[in-house]
A protein has these predicted regions:
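A short beta-strand micro-motif common to beta-rich folds, especially ectodomain repeats
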Residues: 104-115
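Predominantly extracellular/luminal regions of secreted and cell-surface proteins
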Residues: 123-150, 253-254
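N-terminal secretory signal peptides that target proteins for export/translocation
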Residues: 1-6
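Extracellular and select intracellular beta-sandwich modules with Ser/Thr-enriched
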Residues: 107, 119-123, 242-244
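Extracellular/luminal low-complexity segments enriched in Ser/Thr/Pro
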Residues: 95-104
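Cleaved targeting-peptide boundary
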Residues: 22, 26-40
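Acidic, Ser/Thr/Pro-rich low-complexity intrinsically disordered segments
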Residues: 36-83, 89-91, 102, 116, ...
Length: 254
């Protein structure tokens, strides 16, 4: 009847309002304790994704991870939980192998880990067409910048009061894009990107909040001279930790 229809319409508006008004301040925060205290919780997944058509191993960390039953990714994927070395018995970590078909659409997918006791909090998992590289943890200064192939996607997490530095080698006139995905994939970091000369001294380009990227930075730059260049990723407030993770796609794309 009309009265019931109006009631459902008002409830629908309330649901939409809750979705639209979800506070940005909650992005990247640690997941709240699960309603089921025996359910698993997972920390940020590093690397933050996989190259489609390739298999990759991930060591998940968190709580209550023993006795796993599976992983839900939100896309077609082959997930294996190896049984060697007593994998699956440690409540704080678990190794999984993930392989996605070569025709998997590039994008962001939901990621959850399940055990016999429940299902974990949600993380974002990325499927990409670029090779995946993980930060080596030794790249906290321009002089120790981690060399990267191009194109690639680099995954890492910044430490407090420190940036992560990477080195790329380009040809004269080469155009490159640097797309930092952070807030868009649930990170706490308010990232900025900088491009320096090969010594890490002269700043060539900078971005903090790129339009349409939910405060994530993005730079497209044409290098006039061939050689090495330094890329820096840092939180604008110098914060850091496991929840301040990021991924930067590097290549000649729009």
């Amino acid at each position: 009847n009309i009265k019931e229809s109006l009631r459902l319409f008002v409830l629908g508006l309330g649901t939409v309002a809750l979705c639209v008004c979800y506070p940005a301040s909650s992005w990247g925060q640690k997941p709240p304790p699960p309603a089921n205290p025996q359910a698993p919780t997972i920390n940020p997944v590093i690397p933050t994704g996989v190259q489609r058509g390739q298999a990759a191993d991930f060591v998940l960390t968190g709580t209550n991870l023993a006795s796993p039953t599976g992983v839900s990714i939100g896309c077609a994927a082959k997930v294996t939980i190896p049984s060697e070395e007593k994998n699956g018995t440690d409540p704080t970590k678990c190794k999984v192998r993930i392989e996605t078909p070569a025709d998997t659409p590039i994008g962001w997918y939901t990621f959850r880990f399940a055990t016999i006791k429940g299902v974990s909090n949600l993380r974002v998992f990325c499927v990409d067409d670029l090779p995946q590289v993980v930060a080596d943890g030794k790249n906290r200064s321009a002089s120790t910048a981690q060399a990267l192939p191009a194109p690639c996607t680099i995954s890492g997490a910044v430490a407090a009061e420190q940036g992560d530095y990477y080195k790329i080698t380009v040809k004269a006139g080469q155009r490159m894009s640097f797309d930092c995905q952070a807030r868009r994939i649930g990170s706490a970091i308010d990232a900025y990107l900088k491009i320096y000369d090969g010594k890490g001294i002269r700043e060539l380009a900078y971005d903090n909040d790129s339009p349409g990227c939910q405060t994530d930075p993005r730079i497209t730059y044409t290098f006039k001279q061939a050689g090495d260049y330094i890329i820096e990723v840092r939180d604008v407030l110098l914060r850091g930790g496991p929840e301040f993770f990021y991924r930067v796609r590097i290549g000649d794309f729009p």
